[in-house]
Each structure stands twice: as structure tokens, then as C-alpha cells.
């Protein structure tokens, strides 16, 4: 198939190129290489892709192939003439229309990458990687913006329409049927068009301060989409569009290749002029040869919001920067933050199971082309676009992956088919054409939505995942663990097998994600006044900059050092506190029990053009959540969001950490008994201890109040009612329902026995000398259960 594609592309490239062919072709060190001599071939010189690029380049006067992707004038003798225009053959065909500094830019990618990777640019432009529609909806909901209530998704980063209908462009027949039904059932999460996030005037914001949420959105939250180059900060350097992922950038942003025209001292450049992709796309850099897309590439964006990228690496931001480094300073900031190492996801860890090689998984090893590029539809949230579930590879204790029905573990309250999903012998055409292909053995496994996993195969009694790193991993199958009785511990057997409801109702990571980054209280000040120099506050507006595009595919912030366009106002942020342990549990959009994390617990303060406060420590309200829940209390719009945190551990949460933990159940840390005085100002001075009156006449408020916050930030249930929003995207997401909490909660179990310790006669009969170990205690309880059961005969 690759040979067929190359042949077709060469025919296309050579058609209509008579003018270019009859001119004298540059040779030696002429053309692009007269300046860029030494630059790395974008792919290995003997790869089909590089052969193709150079063949097209030769037909357009550039044997090095630069013009194939970049355009430009290969006859130019200086930067002004060389970096202008494009060979007529390419302009008249489907190639570059002008010089493209970054051919990956999504705004011109249909004329560069899209020459071969047809329709990818269309798909990516409508994917969450570019629209960020879900992030926008969720964040603005926390400000109390009415237009995004009731799960509506009206806005994206830019105006965009789904012009080819809602049947996916790509995917298997099963996938297309599955998604068509899903779109029909959940139309709000698959909008047919988006308009750009509005930018209210400062006057409008002063009259309605919650509209400052739009400033916050445009200046802070929207820098991580592929339509722009992003922030010039350590760890955030990247390209645009396709280059965001497929061109390597080091965290320091230095070029370490051999092109003499690219500065080695200026930050913000690619690491090397290479494409990183799948296993076959190997990159040799210094002493390291690697393949695949490193996790840190993904983290140039996935370090805020749900923080799943840095969490996967085991990192959680913290404010201290300890320990000190060799120069006596604090650790350097990464993504503008400093980090504490907790524990990386088991799939990321270098040490693996005994039967597997050393090495962790890359994001792309699990996530599919649809997850990352989209399928041509517009998605309103992550659960709409991502098609994979843990059970797709691991199965359950009762069923191997291929025995599960499609839709397993993302039920969305629908009945699942009774038929097995099976295996498939067929790859997606896109995978077969461009990715590394692997022997299907007995067949490729399928995703929950029916697409083939091109890198995961059934091989006899085993499932093998082929990682883009070059490693092949045997995947543990839960049913095989049960058949072999090879459980690592009794806890695992009980949690995954004995308690059937766990399989039916829980996400795997409800237990295995034993830590989650929890940033409680997002205190945001948006200031439209003047700074200390008397200048009006303003900051980079990522959407304003991304909306200005030139013929070269560049946006306003693309040239290094420009920092894009600015809009009025400046955002200042802080928080209440951070935690990682024992995350709260709730229900996600699929209807399963999942960890929750503070999604955006916005408490906003807004200052007008005269530096006067027009809104102080305000909370939005979720009238839509109140209506869905049918409760009297109106939940605050601050969000505890359902999340797949990407922090899975081999040792899962203990039974007690959920069943004997008020926080996990939603009642707050230690049952919500702490931090209960937010609704009142706290003054710390000389106090009349009889009355609580402040004695000095001149005193200040130590801790200003948050008037509507009558609970601890981690509390989502108070007096039987939900206190804050739990997810904004799907009708099913909410706190654990009362019946489930009642079935789970086992706090106070110790009293069942130990309240009788003062009954000397009884306790003498059941106690033993010394102290029981934990294991002995469990055995004692087991004996009691069996004795009780025997008494029922």
C-alpha cells in the first residue's frame, strides 16, 4: 500500500510541472542547502517518506526536497527571495502556496502535510486539540455563564463548522455506526458548529463582573491548542498544528542540530529537524536513538487543567521548590511551576512485570488516531472524542477483551449488545498507510467503539502491545489471572472478582488511581486597572493572536519574542491548598464511579479601570445542576470534575480508603468538620473571649470571607444535598447517590466489637493475649462470619 501511495503522489507531484522540469536544477550547495547545509533530513534518507519528499522536490527544482513541505524559492540567493513564494508546480497542485516556516501549522497543513496525509488537517482543526470546546464549556460554567449551562457547547477557540455531516470521516463500519448512535443520543456533546469565545468590553465586564471569565479564558486557559505556537516558557516550547506533537522540542528550547542558520543560543527552537511518530520513525540524536513521541512532548500542553501529562510522570505542582540544588537555589520552574514527585503511573514506570522488558508506555501506545486527530466531527468534551477503556486491553475477570460487547465501561446508561466484539484482521486505512504495522497474529483487539488497535494483538493465550518505543509488552488479562488463581494479594481478588458490583459500576482507576492532584480553591483576580507605572493592565490574548494568520501559516505569536496580541485586563491567581491523597469519588458522564478532582473551583474578584473592586470573592451558581438533581439547594458552580487522572498504581487504594473514608464518599476531609468559617470574616487581634468581640478599634480582617462557601472545598455532599457542581458536560455526572453511599459507607465498624471491651465477662472469652496483627485480625473477623453463617443452618 505504501508503494501505491508513493506512486500516486509522484504522479500528482509531476503533473503540470513542465516549467520547473525544463529549468536547470540546483545541485551541490545551491538552493536551500546553500544556506541550510547540514540540516537534518526530516526522515531517514532511505525511508519511503523521504524518498517521496525528494522526488517531489526534484520535480520542482529542489533535489533536497525542502520546497515539498516548506515552499519557498529554491533559486533565491538571499533570505528575502528564498523565503518567498513557492514553485509553480506545487502552487498549481496541492502543495504549498507560499513559504511556510512551520509546515505543520494547522492553518496551511492541508497544503503541506495534507499533500500525503489527506483530510488530517480537517480532522485536527475540529478536534479538541484545536477547539478546546470542552475546557471552555467547563471553565465558563464555573463562572456562572448561562450560555454553557445544561451541557451546551456553543464556543470554541475559533469559528468552525462540521461541513461534511456527522458520520465520522474515518473509522471502521462498527465505529461509524456506534458514533452515529452516540451523536443522536448526546447531540449537545457533538455540536455541528462553534463560534469563537466572545471578548466582552471592559464596560460590559464592570457591569456584570462574571464576564471577566472570558478574559481569564482567553488569556490563561486557551494557550494550549495546536492553532498557535504557545507560550515561550521552559517546558512549553513547541511547534504549531502537526508540529506540536511530531517535531521534538526540548524543555530548554535549544536547537542541537547542524543547520548553521538556526541559533544554538536562542530558546524556542526545535531540538532537531526530525519527525517523531511511530516505531519505524527512529531519531538518532547524540548518543540516543529513540522512536515514538516522548511523554514530555505531550506535556508542553497537558500540564494544567486536568494535569494528566505531568500526573502520568508522577509530578504534582507545589509552591516550595525544595530541595535546594547544587547552586543553593530552588528547583527550576517547569511549565512555570515547581514540582513534587509523588509516583508515576505504572504504565510510565521503567520497571515492568517480570515477563516484560524494562520500559514504560508512551501516550500514543494507548491513545488512537481518533483520540489525537479526531474523526472529522466536532467534539464537546474528552469523553466524546476518546474511544478507549482499560478493559479494551485487560478485559474483566469474567471476559477476555474480545468477549466484551462494544461500549463496555462507557455505557452512558444505555443497554449494551449481547454480542461479543471479537477481533479484527483489518487495520484502518490511515494506520496501514502511515503508521508502523504489526503482524495481526490471531487478530487486532478493538476499542470500546469498534476501531482496531493497530498495535495490540492476540497471540495465543496472550495479548501483546507493541509500543512505539520498540518494546513489546505482554498485557495482563484479568480473566487469565482468575483462571490461574495468580492474584498478587487477597485484596485484589476481592476487589476485582468477589465483589461483582465493582466490575459493573466502577472505572478501573477508581481504585488504581490512588492519588490525584487536588488544587482546592482557585482564587482568580482579574484586574482592569493600572499597574504601578500607571499603565493599564493587559496580557496576551491567545485567541486574538491565533485569529491573525498570514500567508505563511503563522499567527501573531509565532515569531519568537513577539508574545502575540494583548487584550485589556490581567489575571492573578492563587489557591487555598493542595492535596494528592485519597481522592473524592463520584459518578462520571458514562455513569461509572470515578475519582474526582477540583476541576476549576473559581472564586473570582474583579477590579475595574479605577482599581476598585467590583466583585469580591464571588461564586457562580449552577441552576442547571439544581434542576437535574431535583434538590432545594442550588449547588455552587465550583466544580469537582470526574477524571481519568493517569496515576494508576500497582498497589490500588485499600478498601478502607473508600469504604471507611468520609472524604472519598463526598462528605469532606474528616467528614467536613474543618474549614467551616469561610462565610465570615476572620479577625485575629485582642478578643473578648466571652463575646468574641474585637477589642482594638483599629484592626484589619485577617481572612476575608467567601460568603456562600459554607463547607470545606472537598465537600460535595452536605445534609444529603450536593454542594457544588460535579462535572459540567454530561447528565449522569454527579456525587455518589444516597443509596450508593449508604451501601458503601462502613465508618465506625471498629465499634461493632470494641464497644464491648468494658464487658469483662464477654471480652475474656473472645480476646487473646497480646495484640493481633492486621492479618490475624482479618482472620478473626472471617471466623466470626463463618460462625454466624453456621448458626443460620
Which residue ranges define each predicted feature?
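N-terminal secretory signal peptides that target proteins for export/translocation
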Residues: 1-2
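Long, well-ordered mid-to-C-terminal structural blocks that present hydrophobic/aromatic surfaces
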Residues: 437, 507-564, 568-569
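Mature N-terminal segment immediately following signal peptide/propeptide cleavage
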Residues: 20-47, 56-62, 125
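Primarily extracytoplasmic ectodomains and periplasmic/lumenal surface modules that are beta-strand-rich
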Residues: 40-41, 74-75, 118-123, 517-518, ...
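Bacterial N-terminal signal peptides
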Residues: 6-16
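Solvent-exposed helix-loop boundary motif
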Residues: 33, 41, 67-68, 75
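Active-site-surrounding "flap" and adjacent substrate/cofactor-binding loops of secreted or lumenal enzymes
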Residues: 51-74, 80-94
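Extended surface/linker regions that mediate inter-domain or inter-protein docking
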Residues: 81, 85-93, 99-505, 547-769, ...
Amino acid at each position: 500500500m505504501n508503494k501505491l501511495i508513493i506512486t500516486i503522489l509522484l504522479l500528482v507531484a509531476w503533473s503540470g510541472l513542465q516549467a520547473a522540469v525544463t529549468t536547470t536544477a540546483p545541485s551541490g550547495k545551491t538552493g536551500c542547502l546553500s544556506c541550510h547545509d547540514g540540516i537534518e533530513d526530516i526522515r531517514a534518507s532511505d525511508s519511503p517518506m523521504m524518498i517521496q519528499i525528494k522526488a517531489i522536490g526534484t520535480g520542482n527544482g529542489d533535489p533536497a526536497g525542502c520546497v515539498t513541505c516548506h515552499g519557498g524559492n529554491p533559486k533565491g540567493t538571499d533570505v528575502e527571495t528564498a523565503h518567498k513564494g513557492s514553485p509553480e508546480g506545487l502552487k498549481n497542485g496541492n502543495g504549498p502556496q507560499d513559504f511556510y516556516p512551520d509546515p505543520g501549522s494547522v492553518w496551511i497543513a492541508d497544503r503541506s502535510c495534507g499533500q500525503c496525509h489527506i483530510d488530517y488537517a480537517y480532522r485536527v482543526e475540529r478536534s479538541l486539540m484545536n477547539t478546546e470546546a470542552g475546557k471552555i464549556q467547563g471553565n465558563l460554567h464555573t463562572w456562572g455563564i448561562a450560555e454553557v449551562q445544561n451541557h451546551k457547547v456553543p464556543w470554541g477557540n475559533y469559528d468552525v463548522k462540521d461541513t461534511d455531516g456527522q458520520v465520522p470521516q474515518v473509522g471502521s463500519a462498527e465505529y461509524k455506526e456506534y458514533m452515529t448512535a452516540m451523536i443522536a443520543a448526546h447531540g449537545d456533546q457533538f455540536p455541528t458548529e462553534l463560534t469563537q469565545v466572545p471578548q466582552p468590553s471592559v464596560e460590559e465586564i464592570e457591569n456584570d463582573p462574571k464576564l471577566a471569565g472570558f478574559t481569564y479564558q482567553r488569556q490563561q486557559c486557551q494557550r494550549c491548542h495546536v492553532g498557535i505556537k504557545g507560550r515561550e516558557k521552559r517546558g512549553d516550547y513547541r511547534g504549531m498544528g502537526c508540529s506540536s506533537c511530531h517535531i521534538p522540542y526540548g524543555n530548554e528550547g535549544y536547537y542541537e542540530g547542524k543547520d548553521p542558520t538556526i541559533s544554538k543560543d536562542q530558546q524556542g527552537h526545535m531540538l532537531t529537524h526530525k519527525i517523531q511518530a511511530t516505531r519505524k520513525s527512529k531519531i538518532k540524536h547524540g548518543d540516543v536513538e529513540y522512536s515514538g513521541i516522548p511523554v514530555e512532548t505531550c506535556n508542553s500542553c497537558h500540564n494544567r487543567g486536568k494535569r494528566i501529562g505531568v500526573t502520568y510522570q508522577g509530578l504534582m505542582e507545589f509552591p516550595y521548590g525544595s530541595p535546594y540544588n547544587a547552586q543553593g537555589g530552588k528547583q527550576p520552574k517547569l511549565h512555570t511551576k515547581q514540582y513534587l514527585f509523588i509516583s508515576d503511573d505504572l504504565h510510565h514506570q521503567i520497571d515492568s512485570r517480570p515477563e516484560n522488558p524494562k520500559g514504560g508506555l508512551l501516550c500514543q501506545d494507548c491513545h488512537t488516531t481518533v483520540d489525537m486527530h479526531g474523526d472529522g466531527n466536532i467534539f464537546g468534551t474528552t469523553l466524546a472524542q476518546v474511544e478507549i477503556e482499560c478493559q479494551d486491553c485487560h478485559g474483566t475477570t469474567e471476559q477476555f477483551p474480545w468477549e466484551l460487547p462494544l461500549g463496555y465501561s462507557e455505557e452512558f446508561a444505555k443497554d449494551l449488545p449481547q454480542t461479543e466484539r471479537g477481533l479484527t484482521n483489518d487495520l484502518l486505512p490511515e494506520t496501514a498507510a502511515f503508521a508502523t504495522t504489526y503482524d495481526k497474529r490471531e487478530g487486532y483487539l478493538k476499542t470500546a467503539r469498534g476501531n482496531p488497535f493497530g498495535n495490540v494483538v492476540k497471540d495465543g493465550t496472550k495479548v501483546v502491545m507493541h509500543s512505539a518505543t520498540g518494546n513489546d509488552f505482554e498485557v495482563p488479562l484479568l480473566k487469565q489471572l482468575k483462571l490461574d488463581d495468580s492474584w498478587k494479594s487477597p485484596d485484589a481478588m476481592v476487589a476485582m472478582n468477589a465483589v461483582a458490583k465493582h466490575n459493573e459500576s466502577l472505572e478501573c482507576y477508581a481504585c488504581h488511581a490512588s492519588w490525584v492532584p487536588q488544587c482546592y480553591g482557585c482564587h482568580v483576580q482579574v484586574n482592569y486597572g493600572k499597574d504601578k507605572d500607571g499603565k493599564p493592565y493587559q496580557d496576551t490574548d491567545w485567541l486574538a493572536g491565533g485569529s491573525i494568520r498570514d500567508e505563511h501559516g503563522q499567527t501573531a505569536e509565532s515569531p519568537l519574542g513577539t508574545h502575540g496580541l494583548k487584550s485589556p485586563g490581567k489575571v492573578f491567581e492563587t489557591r487555598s491548598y493542595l492535596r494528592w491523597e485519597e481522592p473524592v469519588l463520584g459518578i462520571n458522564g458514562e455513569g461509572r464511579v470515578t475519582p474526582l478532582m477540583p476541576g476549576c473551583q473559581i472564586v473570582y474578584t474583579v477590579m475595574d479601570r479605577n482599581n476598585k473592586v467590583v466583585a469580591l470573592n464571588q461564586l457562580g451558581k449552577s441552576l442547571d445542576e439544581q434542576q437535574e438533581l431535583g434538590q432545594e439547594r442550588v449547588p455552587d458552580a465550583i466544580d469537582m470534575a470526574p477524571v481519568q487522572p493517569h496515576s494508576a498504581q500497582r498497589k490500588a487504594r485499600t478498601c478502607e480508603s473508600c469504604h471507611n473514608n468520609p472524604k472519598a464518599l463526598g462528605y469532606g476531609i474528616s467528614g467536613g468538620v474543618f474549614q467551616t468559617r469561610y462565610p465570615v470574616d476572620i479577625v485575629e487581634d485582642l478578643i473578648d473571649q466571652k463575646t468574641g468581640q474585637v477589642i482594638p478599634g483599629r484592626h484589619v480582617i485577617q481572612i476575608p470571607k467567601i460568603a456562600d462557601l459554607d463547607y470545606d472545598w472537598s465537600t460535595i455532599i452536605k445534609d444529603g444535598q450536593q454542594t457544588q457542581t460535579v462535572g459540567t458536560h454530561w447528565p449522569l455526572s454527579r456525587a455518589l447517590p444516597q443509596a450508593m453511599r449508604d451501601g458503601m459507607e462502613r465508618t465506625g465498624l471498629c465499634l461493632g466489637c470494641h464497644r464491648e471491651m468494658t464487658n469483662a465477662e464477654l471480652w475474656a472469652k473472645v480476646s487473646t493475649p497480646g495484640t493481633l496483627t492486621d492479618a490475624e485480625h482479618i482472620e478473626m473477623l472471617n471466623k466470626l462470619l463463618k460462625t454466624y453463617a453456621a448458626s443460620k443452618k
